[in-house]
Amino acid sequence: MTIHHDSLPEIGPDTKQTWRRTREDHSAGGVAYRRLAESGVLELALIATHGGQRWQLPKGSCEAGETSVETAIREVEEEVGLLTVNEQFLKSIDYWYWDTYRKEVPELVHKVVDFYLLRMIGGELCDDSYEVDAVGWFTPEQALKMLTFGGEQSVVQMASDVLSDK
């Protein structure tokens, strides 16, 4: 049986209860930041995926035996080349999506992502990861306009609020 991806049902309560192929995914990511020494300007690292069309925070799936914060720090280093330290947990977001990558029958995925505020301590911003099309430093205001997903916008807003108090 092949399901055409353009005919997938909208995800709603009924879909979540009746779709047979579902899975849970736990990921973690970070709001990696730096403050420019001369001007004091705050900048956040974002990545672009899907041909540069989707701007988002660096994140990825937790590996076996890894804590959520360890995942966030590892993913930021892998995806944007930065060494960071955790300053604090920000929040978790969750959402549902259709995983159609290399699948004859799509899976309905419930994803939970833990986000941390990560201060840059080394490394250099780069887009060497095969998963990333572009990277960049952006002010919180710029990042809020560029981010594709509302959940990540709420994370950046929270990080901006925390950092404005420092």
What are these regions (language model features)?
Residues L36-S39, G51-R54, E63, D94-W98, ...:
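Short, charged/polar surface micro-motifs in flexible loops or helix N-caps
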Residues E75-V80, F89-W96, M158-K166:
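A general structural signal for short secondary-structure boundary/capping elements
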